[in-house]
Structure formats: C-alpha cells, structure tokens
Amino acid sequence: MYGQPQKKIEGKEKKNFFTNCSISSISTEGRLMAINDKYLVIPWQKPGYINIVDSNNPTNLLQNNNIFKTENSNILDMEFSPFNSNILALCSENNSVILSYISEEITNFNQSNCYKSHKNKVSFVNFNPIVSNLMCSSTSYGEIHIWDSSKMKPIIEFRLSSPNSIFWNPNGSMIGISTKNKFFYIFDPRQEKYIFNQQISHTMSTSKFAWLDNGSIATIGWNSNGNKYLYLYDIKRNEKPYSSILIDKYTSPTVPFVDQEMKLIYSVGKEESYINVYDYSLEGLKKCSNFICTETNHFSLLLDRKYLDKNSQEVDRLVRFTKTKNIYLFVFAIKIKTLNLNKWLIQMKT
C-alpha cells in the first residue's frame, strides 16, 4: 500500500443505546439479536419469546410491551431479509425456520411460513443476498439445507461436521462454513461440491469468518504457539493465507466483521473489551486503530452500511450486547492521513 493514503479510524461509544436487555438464557453460536433501519429484535426471557422495538428510539427494554411468542422452544439464530425490512427469519430448537412479518407500528407479528425439513434443532439461518426466495440453514449436527422460501421445500441437502457459522458470499453463488473442528469450507451449489477447505486454527478455540469479496475470506485462528491471528485467504488458491497479522494472545473467541466498501476489518472478542480495526488490500493487512470499550463484549453485529447516518462522517456502526445486559452503539468515522501526498496525486492522475 506504498504511496496511498493511510486510513485513520476514530471511534466513539454511545452508551445507553438500549438498556436492561433481559435476553433468554440460551447457549448458541447464532446471533443473539437482529437489527436494521426499523427494528431491533432479541430473544426475550422465556424460550420462544422475542422483544421487538424501534431501532431508532433507544429505550429501557423492560418497559417495552411489544413482546411476542413465536413457539415453545429456544430461538438460536435470527436475520432480517435484505429485501424487506419487515421480514424476519428465526430458527429454533424445534427443528424449524420461521419466516415472520413485523407490522410497521409493531402491533402485530405474523408468522407467515415455516420450513420444517430439518431433522434436528436449527442453529443458523441466512437469506441469499441476491435471490429473494433462496435461503440456507444448518443444524449444529451438520445437516445443511439450501431451500426455496416460496415453496418451503429443500433444493440441495448436504452434511458437514459441527458448523459454527455459515454465510453466503456477496453475490450469493457460494456458501462459506466454519466448523468447531477448526476447519473452513466453501460449498458451490452449482457444482454441489466443496471447492475449498483449510484448517484455520491449531488450538481448542473455535473460529469464525467473513467474506471480503466473492473470492477471498477473512478468518481468525490460533497458531501452534497459541497466538491469535487474522488471516486472509484467496479461495482460488487452496493453500496457506496470503496475509496474516497478530491480534493478541488471548484465547477468547473473536469474530471478524468486514466493510467491503471501505476495505476495513473489525475484530471483536467475546468476553473482551477490545475492538481492533484493520485496513486490507491485495497487498495485505495493516492495523489502523484499536479501541477499549467501557464494558465487556458478549455479542456484536456490524450494521449494514445502507443504514448509516448519511449526514455524518461515520463509516460503520457496531452494535454491542454487553455482559451487563445493555446494548451499546460504537460509531466509527474515518480520517485520511496522507503519506507522500504529491506522489500519490501523480499516481492517481496517471
């Protein structure tokens, strides 16, 4: 990245975003909340219940009355549709995926359809980012389905031992899967086979991943000495990572979040208070900034860029569920620190 502007990321924590988050006591690798430009949804107190609030109106969640029962079992993962902000997918220990519609004023929560083809509790669910009726879901036992939400029928079924995260790539043509045995796989539905697999960690700690683009991924793993690294892989070359950078020596699970437009990676550790920010390119990784939060992180989500405040200089928003049962917002802004400015301007002109 010689001669190019060096990114300087600034961050500010907004406390009391949502308070008294009495989340249900479940053990899951899935997402403990879902948020978009309209709503925040969390599994609430009892198995099968959810709390829905206006995501633009911070409040004490114990004072909210929009609590709905979805079913009788624990909710293990949830995601909003990228095509309709009112549609929410929930998966549960009841071996099913529920598609629901939230009314504009949160007066109704209608369960429109239910996918019931899994034989075990469903741990993960994801909307395809391009095809509105295409979805994937997985059980913790490795039963993975690609299915049509308009017909509620499976299209492709395959198995993989102990998934702990599963996501479509940005153009919706492949599925990435990380597993509890520290491997990462990419499945191509068109060929109905795995086209990539690598061991990404050498310790007992499990790893998760994020897509950088359609041909590369970021993942966090531990080397044989127990050091935690951020790795970048090119899936066209089924070999060692093309770039890596040391994060720390802690053993806590850490999740990478990627902003593909700004070429930034955020690493956020569970039960830690640190946020590290990295700039990435084809030439490799470079650390931009690091932040210490006031409260320990339990779970986080990176808000989609289309939901950012267009009138501000913010580039990303990280939504954090803390150990004290509060939901805080961490807002990032960018400053460009230019090295060799004249040389860089000449390069841009040519």
Which ranges hold each PLM region?
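Acidic and/or Ser/Thr-rich intrinsically disordered tails and linkers
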Residues: 1-61, 288, 307-350
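Structural signature of eukaryotic scaffold interfaces centered on beta-propeller domains
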Residues: 23-36, 78-83, 125-130, 168-169, ...
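A common structural microfeature
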Residues: 30, 37-39, 47-50, 65, ...
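Acidic/hydrophobic-patterned starts of short beta strands in beta-sheet-rich repeat architectures
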Residues: 40, 87-88, 134-135, 175, ...
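Structural motif
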Residues: 47-52, 96-100, 183-185, 226-231, ...
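Blade-loop segments of beta-propeller domains
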Residues: 59-88, 120
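Right-handed parallel beta-helix
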Residues: 91-93, 97-114
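WD40 beta-propeller repeat blades
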Residues: 117-121, 125-285, 291-295
